[in-house]
Amino acid sequence: METDTLLLWVLLLWVPGSTGNIVLTQSPASLAVSLGQRATISCRASESVDSYGNSFMHWYQQKPGQPPKLLIYLASNLESGVPARFSGSGSRTDFTLTIDPVEADDAATYYCQQNNEDPWTFGGGTKLEIK
């Protein structure tokens, strides 16, 4: 490989966004919602998680001492057994989890996760408190 070509590849590896992990940023970090009201959680990806006509974004609920539970897969599909109060939407880089109406049992931490690119990555979590 010529020196110029090698140098170009090295520089490309250093350009932010040209390679590396997809970063998922959730907001808010925490929220308190009154019983019966709507909770909305956002997840923004540092690059698109869409491929082959699907959005490879998923949502999980985790309660203390328990493993994460899958709620929504491929952005908007409700996992079997999950109440229809939970819904997901979005595409490319912007996604939303909605819980409407909120019930007392929904108090938990919620995570978005992408598996469009390796390594699979998770958002930082949103802690939901029910008032």
UniProtKB/Swiss-Prot annotation:
Q: Where is this region: Complementarity-determining-2?
A: 74-80
Top-level division of the source organism's lineage: Eukaryota
Q: Where is this region: Framework-3?
A: 81-112
Write down the species.
Mus musculus
Which cysteine pairs make disulfide bonds?
43-112
Under the heading InterPro entries, the entry gives: Ig-like_dom, Ig-like_dom_sf, Ig-like_fold, Ig_sub, Ig_V-set, IgV_Light_Chain
**Cellular component, GO annotation:** immunoglobulin complex
Protein name according to UniProt:
Ig kappa chain V-III region MOPC 63
Q: Where is this region: Framework-2?
A: 59-73
Q: Where is this region: Framework-1?
A: 21-43
What are the BP-aspect GO terms?
A: adaptive immune response; immune response
Signal sequence annotation: 1-20
- Residue ranges of region Complementarity-determining-1? 44-58
Keywords (A to Z) from UniProt: Adaptive immunity, Disulfide bond, Immunity, Immunoglobulin, Signal
Chain residue ranges for the region called Framework-4: 122-131
Q: Which SUPFAM superfamilies match?
A: Immunoglobulin
Q: Does the keyword Signal apply?
A: yes
Ranges for the region named Complementarity-determining-3 are 113-121
| Any Pfam family the entry gives | V-set
Q: Which SMART domains match?
A: IG, IGv
